[in-house]
């Protein structure tokens, strides 16, 4: 089958002819329709330090997808041939304390699709049936293919009460932008997003951000004053992994504020802990999606009118995958979709 693989320990992704995966007793075989390129895939393409320490070579990559069930393991129940599915990319062990307590998103033995095991950038993918999520008929393939990063946005944004609150989002990547849309949809008052990428700040405006602030040109404190904010932000969503952005968030949070952190710093990050202590801040780390509450929330949000389609800015056939990766690496894109049909 046709697949995109990290074939060599160097910069790049390669089209290969890979063997069709075998279906286990508890698995589904999915014929891939569309995939989306994730920031993780860009890290793997670039072969940065994280990738060198994490990714076995060769490896079929990719974990954002939608497809159709074409074969079902003999012990699987609840799925039929032809079901349209996406799936949770974190394969969990089922036997650790958190898995047995129903907190599978906190499994300490997680294996990642397209990271630790063969991925979705292929004509066919095998995953455990437990990880598959049926896509409602009124949700398009395009939207279903980005449910994985949308889930990161939903998990982060819905960590705390948002109704009537003022929200600061640091980092206008696709996940941060989708989080801004979620916050506005569920009733936040002001949603301010910061970055230095003008293209993505404009996307954030289209997705409903109250203000999209280029911190290289504008002071966050001035924006707060313009909005009539006198006490700071109630909720912070840190999506950038940039220390300066997190420091700015700590400076502008209200006392008793709550922060959800999804962005991963490049290394050790020192902060002024006295601000956390004296402001009484709550900080929550976010990894992946809650299984499967986040997935149900995603579908329900879209069905209730949330429009995240503007975040999809580029479409390519998989044969033109290089153009898709070039678009993602440029930073001048939202989500990039590859069609496998």
UniProtKB/Swiss-Prot annotation:
Its EC number is 1.1.1.103. Zn(2+) 1 binds at residues 38, 63-64. Zn(2+) 2 binds at residues 93, 96, 99, 107. NAD(+) binds at residues 175, 195, 200, 262-264, 286-287. Its main location: cytoplasm. HAMAP family: Thr_dehydrog. This is L-threonine 3-dehydrogenase. It comes from Shewanella loihica (strain ATCC BAA-1088 / PV-4). The gene is tdh.
């Amino acid at each position: 089958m046709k697949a995109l693989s990290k074939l060599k320990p160097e910069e790049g992704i390669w089209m290969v002819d890979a063997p069709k995966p075998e279906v286990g007793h508890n698995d589904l075989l999915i014929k891939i329709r569309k995939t989306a390129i994730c920031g993780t895939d860009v890290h793997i393409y670039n072969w940065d330090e994280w990738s060198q320490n994490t990714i076995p070579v060769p490896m079929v990559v990719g974990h954002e997808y939608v497809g159709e069930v074409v074969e079902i393991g003999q012990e699987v129940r609840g799925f039929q041939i032809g079901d349209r599915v996406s799936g949770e990319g974190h394969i969990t062990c089922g036997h650790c304390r958190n898995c047995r307590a129903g907190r599978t998103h906190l499994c300490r033995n997680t294996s990642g699709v397209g990271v630790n095991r063969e991925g979705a950038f292929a004509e066919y993918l095998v995953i455990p049936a437990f990880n598959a999520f049926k896509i409602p008929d009124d949700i398009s393939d395009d939207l279903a293919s980005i449910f994985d990063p949308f889930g990161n946005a939903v998990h982060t944004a819905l960590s705390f009460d948002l109704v009537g609150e003022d929200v600061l989002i640091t980092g206008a990547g696709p996940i941060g932008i989708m989080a801004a849309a979620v916050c506005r949809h569920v009733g936040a008052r002001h949603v301010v997003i910061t970055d230095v990428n003008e293209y993505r700040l404009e996307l954030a405006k289209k997705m409903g951000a109250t203000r999209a602030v280029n911190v290289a040109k504008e002071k966050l404190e001035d924006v707060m004053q313009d909005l009539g904010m006198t006490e700071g932000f109630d909720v912070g969503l840190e999506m950038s992994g940039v220390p300066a952005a997190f420091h700015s968030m700590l400076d502008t949070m209200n006392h008793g504020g709550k922060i959800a952190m999804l962005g991963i710093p490049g290394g050790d990050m020192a902060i002024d802990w006295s601000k956390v202590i004296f402001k009484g801040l709550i900080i929550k780390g976010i990894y992946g999606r809650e299984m499967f509450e986040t997935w149900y929330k995603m579908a329900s949000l879209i069905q209730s009118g949330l429009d995240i389609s503007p975040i999809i800015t580029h479409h390519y056939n998989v044969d033109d995958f290089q153009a898709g990766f070039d678009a993602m690496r440029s930073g001048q894109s939202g989500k990039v979709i590859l069609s496998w049909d």
